[in-house]
Swiss-Prot record:
Keywords: Cytoplasm, Hydrolase, NAD, One-carbon metabolism. Coiled coil: none annotated. Its cofactor is NAD(+). Its main location: cytoplasm. This is Adenosylhomocysteinase. It is an enzyme of class 3 (hydrolase). It comes from Oleidesulfovibrio alaskensis (strain ATCC BAA-1058 / DSM 17464 / G20) (Desulfovibrio alaskensis). One of its GO terms (cellular component) is cytosol. Gene3D superfamilies: Adenosylhomocysteinase-like (3.40.50.1480), NAD(P)-binding Rossmann-like Domain (3.40.50.720). Pfam families: AdoHcyase, AdoHcyase_NAD.
Length: 479
């Protein structure tokens, strides 16, 4: 049964909670290093910094607390926002980045690498709660946890019977314990908070799925902007970012030689495409699993072998999940894997791999090799190496995507926040940024790569029916 006593109490007198403030100087140095690689954010500061369009607005961030995110926070701060921040993953915080932001005073930060799930949800609620008990005007979300906590809180306030139940999902039970405590200490909190939220901008595929589901069933409580499906996010962060950061995570964790190995990539969306091409670039034989015939055909025509997981389980040396679905690697699959096969996930949540099978079985045992690297002995007698406890391998075992590609994503995030700030009367729907802004994000990053655009003549623009300054493609165009 849900039990408020199991939730960590909020302490609104806390300015910050990070692992080690003495790491702030290191964080500042890395932030300075990333500036040149994040031209989109720097341009937004130059363009909007003087007018402070976010002045007087409270912003909650629930997004990986990395050096790149520190630059996003700096941008929001320079635009006038009052900011509180938590990470959206228990392993993704870079403690020197959190220390630098906490020390700078640009935001109140509640994040450290290696949080427990109870601590994680405490941090999320701390980021959503100002000292006077009020909540945010705007939310920057990644995976939808901050948005979900508000929605589940409102749902429980309307139907307290939800708190009388027990939940099989361990993490969801922790969420409900958290909500039970907030309802005990501050009745009506979540309904009050939700009513003041102007909107949320969502970073990733998983969070966007949640938003569209709520929009469809009529439960979405405030407007949302789908940042993930901006072309300059999904076709860059998801594809090119994963193409570099996946290998970084696997190699830092295991020092394994990828060349000559068989790598199984589950899912061939934008993230899966980046992963498959990365592994092939390192010399691996790559197998792909897919449910979508279009994505499967794309993979096959790129020369990848498209198989089922039942076929791939005994073949793979390294397994990478990138589906956004759950239990795509089951206990049965793991039992059939090679001895010491490496299993990791680059989707947002930890349920793509059936970690419960490993954790709940008395016949499976775990030996921790080093942080975020566990050797699980299976019923079969063989072992597998699980990275980051099934959570994001690129952020759990390395430092995530490079600064340049994150500048694309985070420039979209800031533009989305500006749209929400300047349009307080939007309907409770999921929006996407207009094509003109998408093209502008790309334009801001060209000079850093030495790229130069061709300019249409008046006659050429008229011939193809576009404005000389864009947009150059219709909304339905697939890049």
């Amino acid at each position: 049964m849900t039990d408020a006593r199991k939730a960590l109490p909020l302490d609104l007198s806390l300015e910050n909670k990070v692992k080690d403030l003495s790491q702030a100087d290191f964080g500042y140095k890395e932030m300075q290093l990333s500036e040149r690689e994040m031209p989109g954010l720097m341009e937004l500061i130059a363009k909007h910094g003087a007018e402070k369009p976010l002045k007087g607005l409270k912003v909650t961030g629930s997004l990986h607390m990395t050096i790149q995110t520190a630059m996003l926070i700096k941008t929001l701060y320079e635009l006038g926002a009052d900011i509180r921040w938590a990470s959206c993953n228990i392993f993704s915080t870079q403690d020197h980045a959190a220390a630098a932001i906490a020390d700078s005073g640009m935001a109140k930060v509640f994040a450290w690498k290696g949080e427990t799930l109870e601590e994680y949800w405490w941090c999320t609620e701390m980021a959503l709660t100002w000292p006077d008990g009020s909540g945010p005007d705007l939310i920057v979300d990644d995976g939808g946890d901050a948005t979900m906590l508000i929605h589940k809180g409102v749902e429980a306030e309307k139907n307290p019977a939800l708190l009388e139940k027990s939940y099989d999902n361990k993490e969801f039970q922790i969420v409900m314990n958290r909500i039970a405590l907030s309802m005990k200490n501050d009745p009506g909190k979540w309904t009050r908070v939700a009513a003041k939220v102007r909107g949320v901008s969502e970073e990733t595929t998983t969070g966007v799925h949640r938003l569209y589901h709520m929009e469809k069933d009529g439960s979405l409580l405030f407007p949302a902007i789908n940042v993930n499906d901006s072309v300059t996010k999904s076709k860059f962060d998801n594809l090119y970012g994963c193409r570099e950061s996946l290998a970084d995570g696997i190699k830092r964790a295991t020092d394994v030689m990828i060349a000559g190995k068989t790598v199984v990539v589950l899912g061939y969306g934008d993230v899966g495409k980046g992963c498959a091409h990365s592994m092939r670039g390192f010399g691996a034989r790559v197998l792909v699993t897919e449910i979508d015939p279009i994505c499967a055909l794309q993979a096959a025509m790129e020369g990848f072998e498209v198989v089922t997981m039942d076929e791939a389980a005994p073949e793979g040396d390294i397994f990478v999940t990138a589906t956004g679905n759950f239990k795509v690697i089951t206990g049965e699959h793991m039992e059939r894997m090679k001895d010491e096969a490496i299993v990791c996930n680059i989707g947002h949540f930890d349920n793509e791999i059936d970690m419960a099978y490993l954790e709940d079985s008395t016949e499976c045992s775990c030996l921790n090799i080093k942080p975020q690297v566990d050797k699980w002995t299976l019923k079969s007698g063989r072992s597998i190496i699980v990275l980051a406890e099934g959570r994001l391998v690129n952020l759990g075992c390395a430092t995530g995507h490079p600064s340049f590609v994150m500048s694309n994503s985070f420039t979209n995030q800031v533009l989305a926040q500006l749209e929400l700030a300047s349009n307080p009367d939007l309907e409770r729907k999921v929006y996407i940024l207009p094509k003109k802004l998408d093209e502008e994000v790309a334009r801001l990053h060209l000079a850093r790569l030495g790229a130069k655009l061709t300019t249409l003549t008046d006659e050429q623009a008229e011939y193809i029916g576009v404005d000389k300054t864009g947009p150059f493609k219709p909304d339905h165009y697939r890049y």
